[in-house]
Amino acid sequence: MVSAAYFAEVADRPEYDKYKYEQLDCQGFVEKVLYDSGVRKPDGSRYNRRGSNSMWRSALSWRGTIAEAVQKFGTLPAGAWAFIVTDDGGEKDRGYTDGEGNASHVGIYVGGGMVRDSTRSTKTKRDGVGSRSINDFNMIGLCKYLDYDVQNVNNKSQIKSILDDIENKLRELREVLL
């Protein structure tokens, strides 16, 4: 099984920056990095999901909020998938009415508070593959095809300290933005 750390290293390669969103959307980017890092179906072919909602529902061994990931693993694991999920009942035109939310976007957490993704969002002022803050995402998932080798290495007080640091940084960012 491919290590999630290696998967994150592959995702962070500058060679992906040449792709525009129309060439490689968010799902396509994650799937290309899976393939480029050596992850294959048992028959040797590449994984091909029906979008970020399909990834959210069926490609993960664990999922939760960013705070839950930090509490469980002591940190955000490199190679984790970062999602933007809204609680609007699902993407109904694709048959997702299970109440698990609408995963409208997916990227790859590469460490250092950064996510690699493909977007055409004006908020990021780019069209295609690039990097942005984990703070633009609200949910985390661990892909069942990757080896995260994660364990909670922090005790309760260390976890509280990490969460307090994150809250303080978010507060500082809000003050700057407002």
Regions found by a protein language model. Name each.
Residues 155-178:
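Short, low-complexity, charged amphipathic interaction modules
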